[in-house]
Every structure is written in structure tokens, then in C-alpha cells.
């Protein structure tokens, strides 16, 4: 994170995460900087502001994390999440098909880390699984 407080605000105030561990300084052989822990549903995110970072933004084309998705429990929740981002002036894509298993939209955090809300429709997933088993047996 290039600005830990800004990231905490985004994940907590915009996405609804809970600050589980307040910002603190870390200094070890593997990390020097500040960190905090936020929890969103079943996901815990350690937010790191590395001392060695010279203000560079996240680049999804580099080796490592491309993006991660938060799971919406329904298509209604997906729409609610998109509306919530609109209310917080966070740009996002349109809700669209997610490879035939549901719907999704993407957006980015303040450092440009690609994020996604994804709804996987259990009926479509079951149909896809059934089709895969039929195709494998032929």
C-alpha cells in the first residue's frame, strides 16, 4: 500500500471491512514498514505499507497477484455492491456474465489493485458440472 490510512479507509469505509489490528510498525528481515489487518467476511487482509516502496503503484502485469474476488451471495447483493461503490464514487465495470456461471464486475482499490465482486449461481454451476461429466465420459 502506498498510503496505509487511505487503504484502511477504502477497505473499511467503502467495502465494509472491520479493522481487526490497528496500524503498527513492523521490522523484521522480511518486512520493514507499517501494517494493519482488516477482515471482510471470511477474508482477512494484511495491508502492508513497505518502507522500501518508492511510491510505485500496483502492476497486475508483474508476476504475483493479478486480482482477487469477493463473493456475493446473490445477484441482488451484486447490484447492491455496485450501487454502494457508485455512492462512494468508486469507478467499476458494468455487471456482466462471469463465464456462464453467474455475474461479476470489477474495480480497483486506491493503489490500483484489481478487485472483483462475483456471484456464482449454484444452478448454473451445477449445470456446468453436469455437462463436464457428460463430456468426459464420451
Predicted regions and their residues:
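Amphipathic alpha-helical "stalk" segments
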Residues: 26-43, 52, 59, 70, ...
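Core segments of cupin and vicinal oxygen chelate
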Residues: 1-45
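Short, well-ordered turn and helix-capping elements at secondary-structure junctions
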Residues: 21-24, 51-52, 96
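A short acidic-to-branched-hydrophobic micro-motif
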Residues: 47-49
Amino acid at each position: 500500500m502506498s498510503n496505509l490510512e487511505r487503504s484502511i479507509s477504502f477497505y473499511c469505509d467503502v467495502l465494509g471491512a472491520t479493522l481487526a489490528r490497528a496500524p503498527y510498525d513492523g521490522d523484521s528481515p522480511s518486512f520493514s514498514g507499517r501494517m494493519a489487518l482488516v477482515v471482510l467476511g471470511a477474508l482477512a487482509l494484511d495491508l502492508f505499507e513497505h518502507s522500501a516502496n518508492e511510491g510505485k503503484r500496483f502492476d497486475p502485469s508483474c508476476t504475483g497477484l493479478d486480482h482477487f474476488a469477493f463473493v456475493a451471495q446473490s445477484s441482488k447483493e451484486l447490484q447492491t455492491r455496485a450501487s454502494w461503490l457508485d455512492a462512494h464514487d468508486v469507478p467499476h465495470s458494468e455487471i456482466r456474465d462471469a463465464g456462464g456461471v453467474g455475474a461479476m464486475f470489477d474495480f480497483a482499490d486506491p493503489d490500483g489493485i484489481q478487485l472483483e465482486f462475483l456471484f456464482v449461481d449454484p444452478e448454473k454451476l451445477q449445470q456446468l458440472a453436469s455437462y463436464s461429466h457428460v463430456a468426459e465420459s464420451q
